[in-house]
Amino acid sequence: MNTDDTKIERQLTVLLRKSVRIHLSTQRGDVSLERSAYGIMCQLADEGPQRLGALAAAFGLDPSTITRQVRDLENAGFASRQTDPSDRRASVLDLTPCGRQVLEQSREHRRFKLQEALSNWSSRDLSDFGRLLQEFNTSMDRLAAFGLLLCTNGFVFG
């Protein structure tokens, strides 16, 4: 690993740690979301209703793990299953109105924290950072597509 790789790895570790702190700060008040619940809820909000197998594949998790996490969302009233219109033998998971509201509150809190952190950045720096972060995520997706990443409990390991 060269010096740049070492710096990047360190900064990613710091970023993960700080993102956990931001996540934990959203757990104040009446509703708290586990990291896994937040991820599943974002996937459903952004991509629409999905079968559990598709959710498991999206996160690189075993279907039994997703099933447990989904059960928690259903028990909390944040998600519900309906019959899949394309195959009546299967079901799809979607957010409930309550789940959408809770997710939006959590996302709003996260956006506020990001705005605070980035308030002194120039427009150009923000644009560059967004572009580079998108490129990084695309590169990580390519690795995952080749099975070079293992996702466990919401964390990615190479």
Language-model regions: role of each:
Residues 12, 19, 37, 59, ...:
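Short amphipathic alpha-helical/adjacent loop interface patches that line ligand
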Residues 1-36:
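N-terminal leader segment of winged-helix/HTH proteins
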Residues 74-131:
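Charged, amphipathic alpha-helical coiled-coil/dimerization segments
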Residues 8-11, 15, 108-158:
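Terminal interaction helix/tail motif
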Residues 22-65, 70, 75-78, 92:
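N-terminal helix-turn-helix DNA-binding core of bacterial DNA-binding proteins
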